[in-house]
A protein has these predicted regions:
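Predominantly extracellular/luminal regions of secreted and cell-surface proteins
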Residues: 43-85
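Bacterial N-terminal signal peptides
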Residues: 10-18
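Bacterial N-terminal signal peptides that target proteins for export
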Residues: 2-11
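Soluble extracellular-acting proteins and domains
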Residues: 172-278
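Proteolytic processing hotspots in large secreted/extracellular or virion-associated proteins
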Residues: 31, 35-37, 79-134, 202-204, ...
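Sec/Tat signal peptide C-region and signal peptidase I cleavage site
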Residues: 19-25
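Hydrophobic beta-strand residues in large extracellular and virion-surface proteins
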Residues: 42, 52-54, 69, 99-105, ...
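Proteolytic cleavage junctions
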Residues: 26-48, 110, 126-133, 138-204, ...
Length: 278
């Protein structure tokens, strides 16, 4: 009986989510392209609004249509959403800003970019205060959300993240202990480097492994400033070898990995958390 009840609840929740996605239609006020950057101004029902800016090192075929940006008001109590977070108990989507932004270019759009993409979000629905737990999270389409925050600032609330591929974005309150966040981000970076090992020049890969081993040792000593500086070395090494030795292109056909962009993005958000802990 209990299993049947769970199935009924899951089915009912799925129906509500489907109905919500139909009713709360996206209203992108404008998408402006300027060279290697794109800005979208978004206004959704209930006065939920934001502007989001993407900056690319080099983009090909960047148009409003090719970018494939959309947004929706989400149910922040939905189990389908909450289960995509690293922790249901310590992380919660923002009730004052229940917006999820999706950037998902069509496979055949011909859009591509190289290196790192930075993503800036600004909203008047939230207020920045010192020590705020608000963070900028991203996920692959319908996948697990992770913190990508690089910087935060005032002007209501502003945050910047970086990525090597496209994603879904939300703002959450993250109440996890800082050491937990740091360990999680380090593990994500180490796992990503391991997974990309076959794509990276062996000598460069070996040097990057040593860089991360040094970062880990400094973290164990709680020398977070030195660990952050070592991550700068890690990112410079990737940047200096991007291209033939470290693949650095994302394209809409999704047939190759932007190794450089992804690794640098993981390093950037880890460095942010190390600065907070310092």
């Amino acid at each position: 009986m209990l299993n049947i009840k769970k199935l009924l609840i899951a089915s009912y929740t799925g129906c509500l989510l489907f109905m919500s996605s139909q009713v709360e239609a996206t209203d992108i006020v404008s998408v402006n392209i300027h060279g290697n950057s794109a800005e979208a101004i978004i206004e959704l029902p209930g006065g939920v609004s934001a502007d989001i800016t993407l900056e690319f090192e080099n983009a090909v075929g960047l148009t409003a249509q090719n970018l494939g940006i959309s947004a929706e008001v989400v149910d922040i109590t939905s189990q389908a959403l909450l289960q995509r977070l690293p922790s249901i108990t310590d992380i919660a989507p923002s009730a004052a800003f229940p917006m999820m932004i999706t950037i998902e270019p069509q496979l055949t759009s011909g859009f591509s970019f190289s290196g790192l993409a930075t993503v800036d979000i600004h909203t008047h629905n939230l207020e920045y205060t010192a020590g705020t737990p608000l963070r900028f999270f991203k996920a692959p389409l319908n996948g697990e959300f992770k913190d990508i925050t690089m910087t935060m600032g005032a002007g209501s609330y502003r945050a910047r993240g970086s990525t090597g591929r496209f994603s879904q974005f939300i703002i959450v309150a993250d109440l996890r202990p800082q050491v937990t966040v740091i360990d999680s981000k380090y593990n994500d970076l180490q796992t990503a480097l391991n997974n990309f090992s076959a794509d990276i020049d062996p000598a460069v890969y070996s040097a990057l492994l040593q860089d991360l081993a040094d970062v880990n040792q400094l973290m164990l000593l709680q020398n977070y400033s030195a660990a952050s500086n070592k991550l700068n070395t890690f990112n410079r090494r990737i940047s200096d070898n991007s291209g033939d030795k470290v693949p650095n292109v994302w394209r809409s056909s999704r047939d190759i990995s932007n190794v450089a962009g992804e690794l640098m993005a993981y390093a950037n958000t880890l460095r942010f958390s190390l600065r907070l802990a310092n």
